[in-house]
């Protein structure tokens, strides 16, 4: 693989992020929603995208389950595969950001180190980690896919929160506690954060 890379040359793009900013009217960025299964990551991400779209923003959602149907269909749930899953998503998100898009990435992304590696791909203001905080007991009570039940019975191995760890972010840009707040209030928190930092228009 190393020898093959010697024959690969990076081709610089003609259009810049500044060009996209002038046209789109907003900064490109990644909203990285992380948390336990059942915490409400995807629900919140989709609701935020609806509001951003309504405001005229250019957006795209990268969702954990959807990605595993295609791009990452070759990966399982071992620690190594989970790390590779997040690495690939980070690279895909970077391509979208380079094209001026607001990316909403909803992934358990259980390992702190992996999230920080993704963060390192972006300029400081381009990566916003949103910790979707929800107690394990509440996530289990929701269990929309029946995964906790399978994990507790031993049918499903290496399930985050049961027999595989979730490493809580040390200093996320934003925390949304979905155990005690509505989706609407969560959306308002996210939008207020990006608006107050001048990343999207204030209207």
Swiss-Prot record:
Signal peptide region: none
Active site: 109 (phosphoserine intermediate)
Record GO terms (molecular function): adenylylsulfate kinase activity; ATP binding
Keyword Mitochondrion applies: no
Enzyme Commission numbers on file: 2.7.1.25
Functional pathway: Sulfur metabolism; hydrogen sulfide biosynthesis; sulfite from sulfate: step 2/3
Gene Ontology biological process terms, A to Z: hydrogen sulfide biosynthetic process; sulfate assimilation
Catalytic activity: adenosine 5'-phosphosulfate + ATP = 3'-phosphoadenylyl sulfate + ADP + H(+)
Keyword Metal-binding (UniProt): no
Binding-site residues for ATP, renumbered to this chain: 35-42
Keywords for this protein: ATP-binding, Kinase, Nucleotide-binding, Phosphoprotein, Transferase
The protein's role, per its UniProt record: Catalyzes the synthesis of activated sulfate.
Family per record: Belongs to the APS kinase family.
HAMAP family for this protein: Adenylyl_sulf_kinase
Entries under PANTHER family matching the protein: BIFUNCTIONAL 3'-PHOSPHOADENOSINE 5'-PHOSPHOSULFATE SYNTHASE, PAPS SYNTHETASE, ISOFORM D
Protein name: Adenylyl-sulfate kinase
């Amino acid at each position: 693989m190393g020898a093959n890379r010697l024959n690969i040359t990076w081709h610089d793009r003609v259009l810049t992020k500044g060009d996209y900013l002038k046209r789109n009217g907003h900064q490109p960025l990644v909203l990285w929603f992380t948390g336990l299964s059942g915490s409400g990551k995807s629900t919140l991400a989709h609701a935020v995208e609806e509001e951003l779209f309504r405001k005229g923003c250019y957006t795209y959602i990268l969702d954990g389950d959807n990605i595993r149907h295609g791009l990452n269909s070759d990966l399982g749930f071992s620690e190594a595969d989970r790390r590779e899953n997040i690495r690939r998503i980070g690279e895909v998100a970077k391509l979208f950001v380079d094209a001026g898009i607001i990316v909403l990435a909803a992934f358990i992304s259980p390992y702190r180190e992996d999230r920080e590696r993704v963060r390192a791909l972006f300029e400081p203001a381009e990566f916003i980690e949103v910790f979707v905080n929800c107690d394990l007991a509440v996530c289990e009570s929701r269990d929309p896919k029946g995964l906790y039940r399978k994990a507790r019975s031993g049918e499903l191995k290496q399930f985050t929160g049961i027999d595989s760890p979730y490493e809580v972010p040390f200093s996320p840009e934003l925390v949304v506690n979905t155990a005690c707040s509505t989706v609407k209030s969560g959306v308002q928190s996210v939008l207020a954060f990006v608006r107050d930092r001048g990343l999207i228009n204030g209207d």
